[in-house]
């Protein structure tokens, strides 16, 4: 069976099974994305005005957070130079005003929870319960129609669509600076499309958890059979203690209720927070991450040389990646889903073709989102079937076949199963925002639907 045939078969199988899922809890980060498509002349002018030498300093090493315009522009350059995504908290009010005046090209649903809620609930039709730190009218308006709910406790637990929530709280805006592959600024050229995110938000970056989610969490959790947890990445050494304590308690509740929980990584600047997140892995069933996130976790596990090997090539060297994933799975999870440009991998303690098929479905969802900008209905994924499989992933597959005896995307590594898929590549994507969340949530829920 060819890869194209496997893609088509996986799509049909998931289409028939995804309706079985009774409910997914999503916590914790939801916000509004203000997307700006970068223009060379505009960015270079701003760099000159801010002081080029100071800006370039931050293009070499990211600050922990943003308090000056130079740090903002330097962080954008950091992402452009490497073609890598990054996200930092913008603390300073003047920098926030600067970003607001710089403006945006479009407003969209943002935050990992918000993006996944619209995909799982609005497109796939799976009931979801979403944690929304601040339910403003603008935030609520960005949720799609469908079985998307937030909990209220006026007369016992009641689930309502965010647009039916009584009240109007604050807007949490994240400014996203997108650039295409080949984007040129100063003497830098972006090796691939990506973005830098500046979070002008006093809630999500410190992992604000709503009172009802702290006091009545078990009641909310009982309405779900799966959970996806994200949003820990913006915490710092100063802010992590109380939120991590609450998250740990929530994960224990989910584990006691036998709810399979997926923890989605994102770029985490603070080393102490990375260490704390690593300490949560024994409480979750599954983890999702990309090459930058894997390397950053391996660094705190004293595996710096391995981390460097993972980042040395594009696409990431699969032998180094699998070596890194094997170290990470020893922290106690059942499943690790790795996604990078060109291919996805899953290392699992259990076996079955459904793991590979879930990766294929998620790659189809990612290609469709890249091609269309947004997925509006499940049938849109048929268009993704026409996107060609990337040369890079097929080349990596030859290495994986040789090194790990993989056939039809499935093999063994030690006591674990390895599933591999080369991904479909959209040469000129409309947007990269939310593609990682699309990949991880689609793979997790579709794998569960195929196995149940």
Curated annotation (Swiss-Prot):
Q: How is the cofactor bound?
A: Binds 1 Mg(2+) ion per subunit.
| Catalytic-site annotation from UniProt | 437 (proton acceptor)
- Give GO BP annotations, semicolon-separated: glucose metabolic process; glycolytic process
Q: Which SUPFAM superfamilies match?
A: Ribokinase-like
Identify the residues that bind ADP.
290, 339-340, 426, 436
Give the keywords, sorted.
Carbohydrate metabolism, Cytoplasm, Glucose metabolism, Glycolysis, Kinase, Magnesium, Metal-binding, Transferase
Write the Enzyme Commission number(s) for this entry.
2.7.1.-, 2.7.1.147
Q: What residues does the ADPK domain cover?
A: 1-452
Q: In which pathway does it act?
A: Carbohydrate degradation; glycolysis
Q: Which GO terms describe its cellular component?
A: cytoplasm
The terms under GO molecular function for this entry are: ADP-specific glucokinase activity; glucokinase activity; magnesium ion binding
- The organism's superkingdom is given as Archaea
InterPro entries associated with the record: ADP_PFK/GK, ADP_PFK/GK_arc, GlkA, Ribokinase-like
Q: Which Pfam families match?
A: ADP_PFK_GK
Swiss-Prot/TrEMBL cofactor(s): Mg(2+)
* Catalytically driven reaction(s): D-glucose + ADP = D-glucose 6-phosphate + AMP + H(+); D-glucosamine + ADP = D-glucosamine 6-phosphate + AMP + H(+)
Q: Which residues bind D-glucose?
A: 33, 87, 111-112, 174, 437
Cellular compartments annotated: Cytoplasm
The residues that the entry says bind Mg(2+) are 264, 293, 437
- The residues the entry assigns to the signal sequence are none
Would you identify the family this protein belongs to, as annotated?
A: Belongs to the ADP-dependent glucokinase family.
Functionally, this protein is described as follows: Catalyzes the ADP-dependent phosphorylation of D-glucose to D-glucose 6-phosphate and glucosamine to glucosamine 6-phosphate.
Protein name (Swiss-Prot/TrEMBL): ADP-dependent glucose/glucosamine kinase
Show the taxonomic lineage: Archaea, Methanobacteriati, Methanobacteriota, Thermococci, Thermococcales
């Amino acid at each position: 069976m060819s890869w194209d045939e496997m893609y088509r078969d996986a799509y049909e199988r998931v289409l028939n099974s995804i309706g079985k899922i009774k409910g997914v809890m999503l916590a914790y980060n939801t916000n509004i994305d203000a997307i700006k498509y970068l223009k060379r002349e505009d960015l270079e002018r701003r760099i000159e005005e801010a002081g080029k030498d100071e800006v370039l300093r931050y293009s070499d090493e990211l600050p922990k957070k943003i308090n000056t315009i130079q740090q903002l522009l330097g962080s954008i350059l950091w992402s452009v130079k490497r073609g890598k995504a990054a996200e930092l908290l913008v603390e300073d009010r003047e920098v926030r005003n600067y970003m607001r005046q710089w403006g945006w090209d479009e407003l969209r649903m943002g935050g990992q929870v918000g993006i996944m809620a619209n995909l799982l609930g609005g497109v796939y039709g799976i009931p979801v319960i979403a944690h929304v730190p601040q339910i403003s009218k603008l935030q609520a308006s960005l949720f799609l129609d469908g079985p998307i709910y937030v909990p209220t406790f006026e007369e016992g637990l009641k689930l309502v669509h965010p647009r039916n929530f009584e009240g109007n709280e604050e807007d949490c805006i994240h400014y996203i600076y997108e650039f295409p592959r080949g984007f040129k600024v100063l003497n830098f050229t972006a090796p691939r499309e990506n973005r830098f995110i500046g979070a002008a938000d006093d809630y999500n970056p410190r992992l604000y958890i709503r009172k009802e989610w702290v006091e009545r969490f078990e009641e909310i959790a009982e309405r779900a059979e799966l959970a996806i947890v994200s949003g820990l990445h913006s915490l710092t050494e100063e802010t992590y203690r109380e939120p991590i304590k609450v998250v740990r308690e929530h994960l224990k509740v989910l584990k006691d209720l036998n709810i399979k929980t997926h923890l989605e990584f994102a770029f985490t600047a603070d080393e102490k927070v990375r260490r704390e997140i690593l300490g949560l892995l024994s409480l979750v069933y599954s983890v999702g991450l990309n090459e930058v996130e894997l390397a950053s976790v391996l660094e705190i596990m004293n595996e710096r040389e391995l981390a460097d090997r993972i980042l040395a090539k594009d696409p990431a060297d699969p032998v180094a990646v699998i070596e890194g994933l094997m170290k990470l799975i020893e922290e106690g999870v059942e499943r690790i889903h790795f996604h990078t440009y060109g291919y996805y991998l899953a290392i699992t303690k259990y076996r079955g073709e459904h793991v590979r098929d879930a990766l294929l479905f998620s790659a189809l969802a990612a290609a469709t989102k890249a091609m269309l900008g947004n997925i509006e209905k499940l049938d849109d994924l048929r268009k993704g079937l026409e996107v060609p499989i990337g040369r890079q992933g097929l080349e990596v597959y030859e290495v994986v076949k040789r090194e790990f005896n993989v056939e039809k995307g499935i093999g063994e590594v030690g006591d674990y199963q390895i599933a591999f898929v080369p991904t479909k590549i959209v040469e000129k994507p409309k947007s990269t925002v939310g593609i990682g969340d699309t990949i991880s949530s689609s793979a997790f829920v579709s794998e569960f639907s195929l196995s149940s």
